[in-house]
């Protein structure tokens, strides 16, 4: 079993990665005899597609399937179910699912009785390499993504790569958006490997190789979290592609575009701005452009660029009327750019809207 320690001063915990670790979950959770109750919070689709016999000892709370379920209303619904079920400050919440589940469970954990413990068992690739790690919790408002949230570290994270074999290929491709992000901002070797063997990787032909990639991404995320837990400086690098990506998700009302697709488009737009200001060379930009163009995408023929820009105005990374925008200086290197203008955003959105996408 691979173990990655997260040595935060007040909230140290461990990430456990192993194929089949989910089958040990009951014994792992019961190792701590101090928990009065253990509650599993998940989605029905996960219960329908994953062997969850190992969860039979615990009560289960079901939340909605869509990104729109990540809301204050959903959080209140979970809180009410916890109250009725006798949850107290010595209870443990288990977020079993993808990013929607872990974001919501982390948020509920941080506010219920002013904070109780939680652990994560991510079932999606995106969750395993990104959203379950780092302590950010969030729900969406009616107009913007992730603008209501807290910081609350989990007590542990249990990652079972075998869950990936239950996912449709679209979700694997979506998860690779975050992996490619790590490659672009901090790990050129990782990017080179993905670029050269992308189809084999998304087909999950070698799950041990995928497990190694997950380990590398977890280490990168942990490094950023240790350096900047509260997202004031270096951790902002992880937002590469997300300012534009979140705006697209909001524009489409979280319905016709997935988070992974939005991040792919957002990274293209961010690379475009990086090239515009000569942070990124033409050759590097063309290489990124060519690679991402091979990934199935949506048709944006009728996108309203001005309305997408309006969505950017609500981005949580905005401070004092400035955006902390992440640019690439090379493949594997990034920096924070503070002088981005509204015209830059509009040009990038227009570039995305008019990009020649070809679906595989």
What are these regions (language model features)?
Residues 197-306:
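Active-site segments that bind and position negatively charged phosphate/pyrophosphate groups
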